[in-house]
Design a protein with these regions (language model features):
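Short beta-strand-plus-loop segments that form exposed binding edges in beta-rich domains
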Residues: 141-148
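Short proline/glycine- and polar residue-rich coil/turn motifs
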Residues: 118-122, 799-808, 860, 927-935
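A short beta-strand element within beta-rich, extracytoplasmic domains
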Residues: 77-89, 140
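Disordered, acidic Ser/Thr/Pro-rich linker "stalks" and the adjacent N-terminal cap
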Residues: 26-75, 87-94, 118, 161-167
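Terminal connector regions
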Residues: 816-873, 944-967
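Extended extracellular/luminal ectodomain segments enriched in beta-structured repeat modules
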Residues: 65-66, 74-81, 134-136
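Glycoside hydrolase catalytic-domain context in secreted enzymes
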Residues: 167-820, 831-839, 843
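Short, surface-exposed beta-strand/strand-loop-strand elements in extracellular ectodomains
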Residues: 91-106
Length: 967
């Protein structure tokens, strides 16, 4: 759909409406970028096509049920009216039937606006007027049974308040454009030119950062890009993230995100709200599909590859959702997690720490939840202490959509109103608000009147400007307005299409292959292809619109790959989510005619109004309680298996599912995830043996949702592990996956190097008859420690190609940090003792009884196990020195500089708190230093009277030492 302005008649009507709304405010019609509806989805574009002869039509029978239409505007702003060219509803019916929602977050509509209905006499158009409200999405919800006739909307125009006239640009000191000046100096010069309104304009969000025209501050167009450029039609769609994690191939992921970056840059988007670094520990969570899985090391390595690939083109990444968003209570999206500091630092903060310390991304998105009981949106501990002070982050923080407003009565109940919420967020360092808080008129007025914390506002503006100067955007800004219909040169390039297919192939996991049914023989006479996913491949959340023929389904792939002598017959069988059993009989008949049946089941992430489905089953706000196939899918599989025809299940899923029944009934199971546009061809490559599968599970597959939580790296229990009615073991363990060949592990060598690192080597032999990839995985277990440690932890992996009969030596290096733990004092240390070292093609076996760590290991050939005796204790040792005390003549405060040095032999964090005359003063300061590294930390001793601080003593206290200074 092309963004359009409305017809001349509508423009006249809107101008009249604007005049009646305000004598001074200016209004303009916003182009619409996209639209959706509860019914007639394919026709909804007609309500925005500048053609009064075409319409979005809702039949009278459908109006007996709730319906809706939603538009996304190209220019987010203060929406103040909607003009309808419509037929079939009276003004009174519209008053009673319609609820209008204006929102920045379509997942959280908020409250409907109060509106009036007027008819423009010259045109006959209907004008819905309401107090201006900031938003990017406008939704009309239609109550059932009020409009009695078929309703046609020929045109729907959305008016927003235009911005104020540009302030006087005379007398501006534009020396901030001088690239020879230090960046910090350029920031201060520019900041001094900005009005409070311009500072608020800089930090609002509207499909990116809008910039400030008067001062030449550039805009930054952003995109959601976790598995492809999503703000357009026809960009290359790669497998969803969880599938790419299943490849266990970080170098290949680097190439993928480099390609996504190229497609983003071509489209004029220079920042991506990606990747997701959440450690997904609950498969019920709908957003598992966006994550790299349940292990912090795997998430770290794949996350670093994602960030480095995209940033290689000079683009901006925004890692999300910081922190602990991937473990919501009960798997319910955005619910709080409530973890203690140990759990956070052992698991959920790890990928963020590793990515921010090693890749230096320019931006991060905070999460909806809380940290230690404090909403992340106001957590200085998390957003300043850990993120900035410990990890050295010096970019800008983005709020998740609506997260600042959530601190009011929407969720957290920690702020009485938006002004308090805005102040809390600014003081925590949140620079960009996806939502309507920083854009709220009262909040902006508070800034002009000094009721916002202006020091905090200046600080977040500095964060934003620092990134703009550092990336050269003032000199060369590739950002361009979004165009959802234009295709760009790199989109669907042969190289990117081939890369999408390769990543899809490498992500496929073979879970079962009884009697070596796979790969399918060329001699098979007839293949039945059955299931709702067979000819309707699902891409997952945050996917762009597709061109005709862009998506290749499994049915397409099988038809393209099967022998010319093999007949292909197809039956859908049932929908993804519907309860209609009418198609089961046809599926049974189809399967009965075939030599083998390929049944494609799984998640649905499309448009229900187009596909006739009830709802999506995976993605944001689509969480599952049962982990069972929805609708009639399980009944379809049962019926097809009952025919006696050998069944291959293709699980097209965005999370682990309960495959217990399927594992008993089918001959073979492959998981192709949500495999991207080339997924059908890639799946057929595996089915017919044109590619030897080597994907490995990035998440544990339980026997039942009743086992949850069930992660491979659990901690030992004081009592029994099993239930009365179910044992403890998963159905398919983390790291698991089969191949069409076999591998044998041998000759484990473990040696401690002079620098304290540990070298681990193992030999892997391809003992089968086909070339294949093996994913060698290194796990360690700390056998005895001063605190409880995890049963096992992944510490390395390599994906390697080995020819038949060939032996490959894989080498890993463990650092002292890899062997470390957080002791009872939360200090990171290496405790001398025994470590079990295990290398294999999946996570190790264990017996869920007493002495569980002793039972860890592999069956003969499946992996190798050894013991490392490590006798080198390690830990940080911090030394503190007051190096300077200076007086601030402006406010009378004293600035105290404390130098912190790590003279130990291990990287660790620490905290330092200042006490002035025995009273704690200011925020606790965090640090994380490598051995031999120093950091200068400044503290401010305030002066109550502004004439000098009368303090007598200063005491700086860390966890284990203090430094005292008398005046």
């Amino acid at each position: 759909m092309t963004p359009t302005t409305i017809s001349r008649a509508l423009a006249i009507a809107l101008a009249m409406a604007a005049t009646s709304l305000s004598a001074t405010a200016r209004h303009e019609v916003s182009p619409v970028m996209s639209a959706s509806a509860s019914v007639s989805q394919t026709e909804v574009a007609k309500a925005f096509d500048n053609d009064n002869t075409t319409a979005w039509t809702v039949d009278a029978t459908l109006l007996k049920h709730p319906q809706w239409i939603m538009a996304t505007v190209a220019n987010p702003g203060d929406v103040q009216s909607i003009t309808l060219t419509q037929k079939g509803a009276t003004a009174d019916q519209l008053r009673k039937a319609i609820e209008i929602y204006v929102t920045y977050d379509p997942m959280n509509l908020g409250e409907p606006v109060d509106f009036t209905v007027a008819t423009d006499r010259p045109t006959g158009n209907t004008i819905l007027k309401f107090p201006a409200k900031y938003g990017a999405h406008v939704r009309l919800a239609i109550k059932p049974g009020v409009i009695s006739r078929t309703w046609n909307i020929y045109e729907m125009a959305i008016a927003i308040e235009a911005g104020d006239s540009v302030a006087d640009d005379s007398g501006i000191d534009r020396s901030y454009l001088d690239t020879s000046l230090p960046i910090d100096r350029r920031i201060e010069i520019l900041l001094a030119q900005m009005t409070p309104e311009e500072k608020m304009e800089l930090i609002r969000e509207g499909w990116g950062i809008p910039g400030v025209k008067r001062l030449g501050i550039p805009d930054i167009k952003k995109v959601e890009a976790i598995h492809g450029y999503s703000y357009g039609t026809g960009a290359t769609m790669f497998p969803q993230v969880l599938g790419m994690a299943a490849s266990w191939n970080a170098p290949l992921l680097y190439k993928v995100t480099e390609a996504i970056g190229r497609e983003s840059l071509d489209a004029g988007s220079i920042a991506a709200w990606s990747p997701v670094l959440d450690v997904a520990t609950d498969p019920r969570w709908g957003r598992c599909e966006e994550s790299f899985g349940e292990d912090p090391y795997l998430c770290s390595e794949m996350g670093k590859a994602w960030v480095n690939g995209y940033q290689s083109l000079g683009l901006i990444t925004t890692s999300k959702h910081f922190g602990a968003h991937g473990a919501p209570l009960g798997g319910r999206d955005s619910h709080d997690v409530g973890f203690n500091e140990r759990e956070m630092r052992e698991i959920h903060l790890v990928p963020f720490r590793n990515v921010f310390r090693e890749c230096r991304p320019q931006s991060v998105m905070m999460s909806y939840g809380d940290y230690m009981g404090v909403p992340v949106g106001k957590s200085k501990e998390l957003l300043k202490g850990i993120l900035r002070d410990e990890w050295g982050f010096d970019g800008f923080i983005v709020s998740d959509c609506g997260a600042i407003a959530n601190m009011t009565s929407r969720k957290h109940y920690t702020a009485l109103d938006k002004i308090e919420a805005a102040n809390d967020a600014l003081r925590a360092g949140i620079a960009t608000n996806c939502g309507d808080t920083y854009n709220d008129k009262e909040v902006i007025r508070a800034a002009t009147e000094g009721r916002l914390d202006m020091t905090a506002l200046d600080d977040v503006c500095r964060d934003m400007l620092r990134v703009m100067f550092r990336t050269g955007l003032f000199e060369n800004n590739p950002s361009r307005p979004l165009n959802w219909d234009k295709q760009f040169p790199s989109w669907q390039s042969p190289e990117h299409v081939a890369l999408a297919r390769e990543m899809a192939r490498q992500s496929i996991v073979l879970l079962k292959n009884e009697d070596s049914l796979l790969p399918l023989s060329d001699d098979i006479r007839t293949i039945a292809v059955i299931g709702p996913g067979a000819d309707n491949l699902q891409l997952g959340d945050y996917s762009g619109k597709q061109l005709p023929g862009q998506i290749k389904s499994v049915l397409d792939g099988i038809k393209a790959s099967a022998s010319p002598s093999t007949g292909i017959i197809y039956s859908k069988g049932c929908g993804f989510t519907t309860d209609d059993p009418a198609g089961l009989a046809d599926a049974v008949e189809t399967a009965s005619k075939a030599d083998v049946a390929v049944v494609v089941l799984g998640d649905y992430s499309g448009h229900p109004s187009i596909d006739g489905e009830k709802r999506p089953t995976s993605g944001e706000n689509h969480d599952l309680a049962s982990l069972r196939f929805q609708g009639m899918q399980q009944e379809l599989l049962d019926a097809v298996c009952a025919t006696g025809t050998p069944v291959v299940l293709v699980a097209q899923i965005g999370r682990p599912y309960d495959l217990s029944s399927a594992s008993r009934q089918t001959k073979a199971i492959i998981v192709n995830w949500l495999p991207g546009q080339e997924g059908g061809l890639a799946t057929a490559d595996v089915l017919f043996g044109n590619y030897n599968p080597a994907g490995r599970l990035p998440m544990t597959f339980p026997q039942s949702a009743a086992q949850l939580p069930l992660n491979y790296n659990f901690k030992t229990s004081g009592r029994r592990y099993e239930y009365v009615d179910m044992d403890f073991y998963p159905l398919y363990r983390f790291g698991y996956g089969l191949s069409y060949t076999t591998f044998a592990y041998s000759n484990l060598r473990i040696s401690t190097l002079p620098d304290g690192n540990v070298e681990v080597k193992a030999d892997i032999t391809n003992t089968g008859s086909r070339t294949g990839d093996e994913v060698a995985q290194l796990y360690i277990t700390d056998m005895y420690a001063s605190v409880k440690t995890r049963v096992m932890e992944l510490k390395g992996f390599r994906r390697i190609t080995i020819e038949p009969g060939q032996t490959h030596t894989v080498t890993f290096t463990l650092t002292p940090y890899d062997l470390s733990l957080l002791n009872v004092d939360m200090d990171r240390v290496v405790e001398p003792g025994d470590f079990k070292i295990m290398v294999g093609g999946m996570s190790p076996d264990f017996t869920a009884k007493d002495r569980i760590k002793d039972s860890l290991g592999y069956p003969e050939g499946r992996g190798v196990t050894g013991t490392l005796r490590y006798d080198i204790p390690a830990g940080a040792r911090y030394e503190f020195t007051i190096t300077d005390i200076s007086h601030n003549l402006t406010d009378g405060s004293d600035i105290v500089t404390v130098n912190v040095t790590n003279s130990g032999n291990l990287t660790d964090t620490g905290q330092l708190t200042m006490y002035v005359d025995g009273t704690r003063t200011g925020d606790t300061r965090h640090y994380e230093l490598n051995p031999g590294q120093s950091k200068a930390i400044t503290f401010t001793v305030p002066s109550p009277e502004g004439i000098g601080s009368p303090w007598k003593s200063l005491n700086f206290i860390s966890r284990h030492s203090s430094i005292f200074h008398n005046r």
